[in-house]
């Protein structure tokens, strides 16, 4: 599973949807980045392949960051993303 995580302004919790295939995850990531650059469409509706009925609609102007990562079955103490620690 591949996760696409959106960080929203003034929200402590990210929004996450998942894709089964890496190509589909990369395509969704690119679509979100293009939407942020262009501001079109104004609203972005995302669905999740892991949770069938999960739908998220977000105002594109409120997205501050997007990241893609592979979700592994093993649990680790390190969260995906960027770290300022060495």
Swiss-Prot record:
The organism's place on the tree of life at top rank: Bacteria
Protein name: UPF0367 protein NATL1_01981
Family: Belongs to the UPF0367 family.
Database matches in NCBIfam families: PRK13683.1
């Amino acid at each position: 599973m591949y996760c696409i995580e959106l960080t929203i302004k003034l929200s402590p919790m990210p929004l996450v949807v998942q894709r089964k295939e890496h190509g589909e995850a990369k395509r969704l990531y690119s679509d979100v980045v293009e939407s942020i650059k262009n501001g079109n469409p104004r609203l972005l509706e995302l669905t999740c392949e892991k949770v069938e009925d999960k739908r998220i609609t977000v105002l594109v102007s409120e997205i501050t960051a997007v990241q893609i990562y592979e979700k592994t079955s093993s649990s680790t103490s390190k969260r995906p993303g960027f770290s300022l620690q060495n």
